[in-house]
């Protein structure tokens, strides 16, 4: 008879191919190779201002108008710890180079956390914490005829040591950013 052993992996492992061996009395009787690699995909991006019902409970008006809802999925075979959410390009408030914190406001009532573990096959919703669509900007403006641009959302993980990026097209239409109709769509679709 054999026994089954589960070993928690955590998020401090080097991704790659591992060999799992079945050992009986110091003799390897079977071996299986397994690739353990996270693969984070940005499934959906929503503006809080356009989807207030999807914001977390007790989100204030400023948070609703300036933050973003991001749905991510790990389609890989190993866990990932998301450590930074970045916005670059034509957004009112791009993520500063020297960001203090992660830019992530993941809410799991009653606890809020700023880094997020995503296991293989898991889907999670997180919220931005840097007000990328806040009402003040030196980068973009809202005009009655509409202003178009493009921005990139990046998620950095500490296991894969890379940034997953997704580009979006954006249009700002209205009198000012406080009362602006902002539409986004995934680029390259």
What are these regions (language model features)?
Residues 1-189:
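Acidic, polar-rich N-terminal leader regions of halophilic archaeal proteins
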């Amino acid at each position: 008879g054999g026994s089954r052993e589960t070993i928690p992996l955590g998020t401090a492992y080097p991704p790659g191919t591992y060999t799992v061996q079945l050992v009986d009395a110091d003799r390897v009787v079977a071996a299986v190779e397994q690739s353990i690699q996270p693969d984070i995909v940005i499934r959906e991006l929503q503006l809080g201002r356009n989807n207030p019902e999807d914001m977390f409970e007790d989100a204030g008006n400023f948070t609703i108008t300036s933050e973003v809802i991001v749905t991510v999925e790990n389609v890989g075979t190993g866990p990932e710890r998301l450590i930074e959410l970045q916005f670059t390009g034509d957004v009112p408030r791009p993520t500063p180079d020297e960001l203090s914190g992660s830019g992530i406001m993941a809410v799991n009532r009653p606890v809020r956390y700023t880094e997020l573990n995503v296991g293989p096959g898991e889907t999670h919703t997180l919220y931005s914490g840097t007000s990328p669509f806040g009402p003040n900007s030196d980068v973009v403006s809202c005009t009655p005829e509409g202003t178009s641009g493009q921005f990139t959302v990046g998620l950095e993980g500490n296991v894969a040591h890379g940034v997953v990026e997704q580009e979006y097209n954006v249009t700002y239409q209205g009198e000012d950013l406080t009362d602006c109709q902002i539409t986004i769509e995934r680029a390259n679709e």
